[in-house]
Amino acid sequence: MIEFRYFIPVFSLFVCLLTFFRFGTILNPICIVALWWSFWLFVANLSLTGLFIPGVHTQVLILTMIFSMLCGGILAKRRAGFHGKNILRNNLQLHKKWRYLYFILGFLIPVVSYYFVKAIRLFFSEGILGYRDAVFGDVDRPSVLFGSNYLELLYALLFSPIIHVSLLASIVFYLCFQDRRFLAVSVVLVIMDAVMRLGRFNFYYFVFFLFISYLFIRQRSRVRDPIGNGFRAAIKNVRVTIGALALCMVLILSVLSVMRSENSDNIANLLKRFAVEYHTVGFVLFDESLENPTSRLNQEISYGRSLLGGIDTIAVILLRRIDRNLQSISNENSPLMREFQVVGWDYDGYPILYNAFYTILYSMYLDGRELFFFAIPFLYGYFLSTRYQDWIGTGEIGTLMVLNMLTYTGIFSIFQSPVEGTIFWVTLLLLFLFNRIRILRRIQPVEAL
């Protein structure tokens, strides 16, 4: 695979140049997502930790996906904008409207606190590693934390998306309006949710949303208009706080990693696992399924159900009243993805075992084979680019939230497929519901308001 080691840097340079000429900066979401995937594919070719190097077919599919996304982003044009004074007023109204989420979070905090305290108690009775194995339920065994598959499902369908969208929105409103209370409540919920499931990605999400929101707001602040001037003044006051928050989240992430690890793991092994293997093992898992002619990936095709997995799950829940034998695509995929696979050999000659991290590549190939590696990334790049251009052109905070969510999808798809879960789709629904009234009101004449 030496050829890919040389080709990927050249390809990445091509992406940077093309997006720079299109958007005037390489720090645009198309380039960020493309370089993210290209960088980790390059690292995968180095096999730094003993993981197998992905095959030619897999690497060609990934590069095709990146190129198709690039084409969609380059060809996209921004929609017609609105007058600056209307946008400024709408941003203020949107901030007030999102404060209604406080009431919803007020109901969430007691429930999440209850399960948080229960999780702490179970840590001491079950042990950290024992709790980690039992916290997620399945069809045959309910979660030790929730005690019921229905309660766990309710939490996944309602509570997790609300926590997710509150994190996304509170960071934006903190950077734009210094709304510390909204951010504090969201951070507390994120920490409790992460600890009770021993999940580290919540903190990764926080650092990402903080960075990407600051980056995009800073870019919009360079536009010389009333909105840009307001953003420029706002972000000057939060730079130190941003650094402190990011550092705290990294420290908590490190502590949770130590808690979840085996006693024999040292800091170097933890860093190697989280910084390298977690970001590249998905290529190997997908490659092994792709090259196995008897795997489900090669024996079946799901015609779009996998990429609409969250919607599919909700639909199956409703339709089970008619046919109790119905299974969602995520339930069909889960048993196979939970099986550990040998993905390499460490320096001591022991096999490296991983599961779950199949990336969005698995969903796309299962849905539509090679065709979907052209079509889906093109559409994704197109919508990502239009949201970015809309944001730079208008400065609408609602557009920024959707832009952040789409960028998040492109970045974290390297681990698992966000669209196959319910959090992504319910979060989009919540964004739509909170922004819809504002959209309807802004088209009214100014004199009528």
PLM segments and residue spans:
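Hydrophobic alpha-helical segments
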Residues: L353-L449
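Central hydrophobic cores of alpha-helical transmembrane segments
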Residues: I30-F39, F182-M192, A244, F378-G381, ...
